[in-house]
Amino acid sequence: PASYAPIEAQVTTAPPAAPDFDAIRSEVAAEPADAYLDKETREIVPSVTGVDFDTAQAQAVLDAAGEGETVSVPLLLTEPKLTTAKLEANLFKDVLGSGSTTCAGPSNRWYNIDLAAKRLNGTILLPGETFSYNDTVGPYTLASGYKAAGTYQNGQSVDATAGGICQLSSNLYWVTLKANLEIVERHKHQFNGGYMPVIGTDATVWSDQLDFRFQNNTDYPIKIESYLDKNHKLHVTIYGTDTTGIHGEPYHVVISTVPYKNTYQPKDSIPVGTEPQ
């Protein structure tokens, strides 16, 4: 049978290594951070609760503890100013401005307005960001899907690619005035289009020469909703968070009316003394 010889072992005890509270604090401490909407994804980035503790207090608690006793170090929690729940509850909850206009004209014009409205719909602007109509719904080419329809050029009504899109830019301008947003760039038409209920609320755009731009001067993100319904009525609404209660209501006043005059120009194909029928 196997034989066993006794083994002598010397047992020594030693105090545990003192914890490095500064190192622990550097691992667990966090600054509070507000929730926000990501610029690229347009999704909510959750808020962060601030975490910290007093290293001197932690050392004092440890020094006062008996052997084998479990100690707890109190954490200092700091809530951010804008939590995830608060942002979700306030995001796009208010109508800052809304307006509708009726679209007339041939089917190509309706088609262009509908296409532009679909490209505009769902646009989100963060606080301080500037919106560009041309960058959002352009380019105004056949290759990008637009068709030829009536528009004003050089004082005349002609067919041109993307004709009709100015009704959407005008409708949007009208709504931004209601929402009290900051207008950065806006150009009026040579003639009153007739589709805007208030004279002076139109906004013409074209290629890279004329744009309609405005800035989100609120403290929260804003979102644009736009669509053309089956009755050819164009709807534009801007959603956001109303923190001021200040809104605009554009109107016009007719001060005077200037009668028009006929201007006659000779044309070789028409006999002298006659007018075209």
What is each residue range found by the language model?
Residues 3, 12-33, 38-277:
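Well-ordered beta-sheet/strand-loop patches within structured domains
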